[in-house]
Amino acid sequence: MKLETFEMERLQSNWEHRVAWNLAESGVHPLRVEELAESEADRTALLAQPLGYPQTTGPVGLHTRNSSMYPDGSAEHIQVTNGGSEANCITLMHLVERGDDVIVMMPNYMQVRGLARGLQANVHHWHLVEDSSTGVPRWRTDLDRLRALVTSRTRAIFLCNPNNPTGARLTATELDEICAIAGRHGAWIVSDEIYRGAELDGVETPTMWGRYQRVIVTSGLSKAYALPGLRVGWLVAPPDTVADLWGVHDYTTIAPGAISDRLACVALTPARRTMLLARTRGILRTNYPAVKRWIERRPALSHVPPEAGAITLVRYAHKINSTVLMERIRDEHSVLIVPGDHFEMDGYFRLGFGCDPELLLPALEHVGEVLDKIEAPEVPGSAHAR
């Protein structure tokens, strides 16, 4: 299998630990081990953890805690993985073969599209649409376009909900209609829900799980839970599909890490899960207003307010390519952003705002200093939020 370069991951891997301000990150400021394992009992159990192979599908206790987040879920519906990225990877390796038609929501985290192309599938894009018709700007699904794309040859429809990079979330009505469209042709739906729980208004995004038989949900602790270093993810699927995916997992990473398993069980106890999500939402509510004010001060910028996740997709009118803009901001001011080119959306950049609030404002000012040097046309009142 020949894989194309994953441009965003390569950018972040090369630069995120070298710049002074990282606004390319889509999660929130991570916790320390001492913040997660607060009790003496948790710390004692952590230090006593044998460093052998854990259960390769993840510990039973973690299965139970994962499944409780999904309607009618049980331990048999869960496969624990090394991050949400492995959950996506083994799902594609199981479902997709050469010549299959797959539909990928765009814009999106480009892992799914890259893997599908590497597997020699026929990849069709299904774009979210900027819509202000209701008076409240949002990125919405184009269901008519999806109906036109899905055929009897469609193997799977891949969603990211809440969406990366827009921060949009789909409504329950939209999810049900997507299921109806898929059901007419027997297509699978794979829903990456790793930002679920990181909603700015505190209302949890509805899950795709339980709406249709051929659904696989992927998720993990990296984004909403601020625990990317644990590299713990999971997928939710019908039990027979979980068994098949376990077989693929045998060929990838075999098992999660024992220490990560232990800390994930701590993180997903009901009380601790509530605390972690409240912390994330608190950071988002503190930081997003500063981002919004920064955009509003600049007539050449506009955005649709994000609903979930520590990210927003900013449109700019400046006469510069998005990758060149990113490089100038990085090289001149040591701030990292994600260019719209990485989502096939030149004229935009993705801005992460989940960092320490004391770092966010100076980072934004540095981005602004570069933008101020670049020619931008006079921009009339935008239809987007300012």
PLM feature segments, named:
Residues 72, 103, 147-148, 319, ...:
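PLP-dependent enzyme catalytic core of the Aspartate aminotransferase-like
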Residues 211-285, 292-293, 365, 376:
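Conserved core segment of the aminotransferase class I/II
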Residues 1-83, 90, 270, 373-374:
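N-terminal small-domain helix-loop-helix segment of the aminotransferase-like
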Residues 60-101, 105-108, 220, 319, ...:
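Phosphate-binding glycine-rich loop
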Residues 129-203:
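Active-site phosphate-binding strand-loop segment of PLP-dependent enzymes
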Residues 92-138:
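PLP-dependent aspartate aminotransferase-fold enzymes
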Residues 265, 281-291, 303-316:
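Conserved glycine-rich beta-strand-loop-beta hairpin in the small C-terminal domain of fold type I
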Residues 119, 184-185, 298, 333, ...:
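Helix C-cap/helix->beta junction micro-motif
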